């Protein structure tokens, strides 16, 4: 097929549980090749060139509504404006719905961009990005100790990256001008304790899934931020995705933090 195009369309894909809605969707695909697979049933699918743009995309999961103000995607660039992942339920409702402890996320980012090469449609999927940028993100993570503790062993980030099934490499990921807030409560606390990391800037080098033979798999992370809006904090963190033992090294430094600076975290636990 030489060319397929779709212009200014509204499409809703609803499987009964998690509807995906596109508004003002325009798409173009050039030189589409369909061929039978030699060893498996079905058809293989190749696209030489494509371009997709849509506004006000939304997708619901069990606990969240995810939305994008704008998405532009082709085989070399991605632009996402006004990303948000908002809880569908209040904290009190969420606590009643989960059998064991679980984080509740409230996320947004002004813009996410990526440059590189990726193949998302063929049988041999791959992501090889030279740069990913996230600008002005705001992340709130809430955990309640009221539900039972989850006894499962938690996978470290290196193992989680290894679990990605396709080859993926991001040479540089930059998170800029962002805010991270972590809140935690217990059955005895008077509200949640709060840790705030503002003016949050992070660089991640060689984020990967350890699926490309011969390529380095070590990940280096540097973070600079303001801790509790009072003290500079720097963090160096590294791990090797290819290391089955999931070893990691992390160090940090903060200065001039007054004792009262951590009151927002410990005060709710004092009676």
Label each residue range with its predicted role:
Residues 69, 123-124:
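Short, T/G/N/S-enriched strand-turn elements that build extracellular solenoid repeat scaffolds
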Residues 100, 255, 260-271:
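Strand-loop-strand
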Residues 85-93, 257:
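Surface-exposed extracellular loop regions of Gram-negative outer-membrane beta-barrel proteins
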Residues 130-142:
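Surface-exposed edge beta-strands and adjoining flexible/disordered loops or tails in beta-rich
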Residues 91-100, 104:
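A cross-kingdom feature marking solvent-exposed beta-strand/loop segments within repeated
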Residues 147-153, 268-270:
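Flexible, surface-exposed loop regions and adjacent strand-edge segments
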Residues 1-80, 118, 141, 154-250:
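Elongated, acidic membrane-bridging lipid-handling scaffolds
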